């Protein structure tokens, strides 16, 4: 039996290569980039009980009870807010400036519902290549942080072709679940060591006040030889606003897709 030291584990070797290639694969290296974005935000009321109709924001909206549905865990949910937008996004690095031109948008749902405020909070730019990811006022350690191996355990679980690219599946778990970390898995391209996709939940011990759980899923596309850009993203939030009574909460979902990437084409300052 050959016992390998931790630095010789296949998972450790792979993670070291991912970290070494971060400067190449991180979009922050680019002078500029542009893309068309589609964003869909949805907020559903869940954990609905008999007291729901007496709550202030919906006290006089009993007609909404006709739209009740049942979630996968057999709890009642009520669609509350739906917002969609199509926009053109531009970013330049030095100096940093960005502009988003909304081409089309719509929002439907319950006016003045407390859940609506979370639409803005869900508009996050989660860059997994950063050492720290800020979420709702808390700083989480990324599994791609330069020092991530001191906070996470990594496991090389699988390898396969995704499309025409050979990738490794790297699973990650926090060493201490009370730390602000994630658990999940990522697929890593074997040539560029870029992240092809990642799925992650916040650690069980993370305290985000009203947020019970947060899940993020990202998929990247190689748009040039040394440029990978975020192509698709799903963000799920389980929000509990009435923790003491546990009467109801919210399920928030953001779905994003990006296409028509333009790389390193600078625009005038007055664009």
Language-model segments: which ranges?
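Short, hydrophobic/aromatic-rich segments at coil-to-beta transitions
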Residues: 32, 163-171, 196-199, 227-232
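Short, surface-exposed coil-to-beta transition loops
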Residues: 180-183, 212-217, 251
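Structured extracytoplasmic
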Residues: 4-167, 173-181, 249-271
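Periplasmic N-terminal soluble interaction domains immediately after the signal peptide in Gram-negative
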Residues: 1-9, 21, 215, 235-247
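Surface-exposed extracellular loop regions of Gram-negative outer-membrane beta-barrel proteins
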Residues: 190-204
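Outer-membrane beta-barrel proteins
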Residues: 28, 48, 203-213, 217-220
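Extended lipid/amphipathic-ligand handling interfaces
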Residues: 184-186, 190, 215-225
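Hydrophobic lipid-interacting interfaces of membrane-associated proteins
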Residues: 40-43, 175, 203, 236-241
């Amino acid at each position: 039996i050959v016992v390998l030291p931790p630095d010789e584990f296949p998972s450790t070797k792979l993670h070291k290569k991912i970290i070494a290639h971060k400067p190449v694969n991180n979009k922050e290296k680019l002078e500029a980039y542009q893309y068309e974005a589609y964003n869909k935000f949805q907020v559903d009321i869940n954990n609905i009980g008999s007291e729901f109709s007496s709550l202030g924001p919906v006290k006089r909206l009993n007609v909404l009870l006709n739209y009740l549905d049942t979630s996968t865990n057999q709890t009642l949910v009520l669609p509350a807010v739906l917002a969609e937008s199509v926009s053109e996004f531009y970013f330049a690095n030095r100096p940093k400036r960005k502009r988003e031109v909304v081409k089309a948008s719509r929002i439907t749902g319950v006016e003045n519902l407390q859940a609506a405020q979370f639409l803005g909070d869900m508009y996050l730019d989660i860059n997994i290549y950063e050492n720290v990811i800020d979420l709702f006022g808390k700083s989480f350690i990324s599994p791609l942080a330069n020092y991530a191996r001191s906070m996470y355990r990594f496991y090389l679980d699988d390898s396969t072709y995704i499309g025409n690219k050979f990738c490794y599946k790297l699973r990650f778990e926090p060493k201490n679940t009370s730390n602000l970390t994630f658990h999940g898995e990522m697929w890593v391209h074997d040539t560029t060591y870029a992240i092809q996709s990642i799925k992650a939940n916040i650690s069980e011990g993370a305290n985000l006040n009203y947020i019970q759980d947060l899940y993020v899923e990202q998929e990247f596309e190689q748009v040039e030889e040394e440029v990978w850009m975020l192509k698709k993203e799903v963000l799920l939030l389980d929000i509990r606003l009435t923790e003491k009574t546990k009467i109801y909460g919210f399920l928030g979902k953001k779905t994003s897709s990006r296409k028509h990437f333009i790389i390193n084409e600078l625009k005038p300052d007055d664009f």
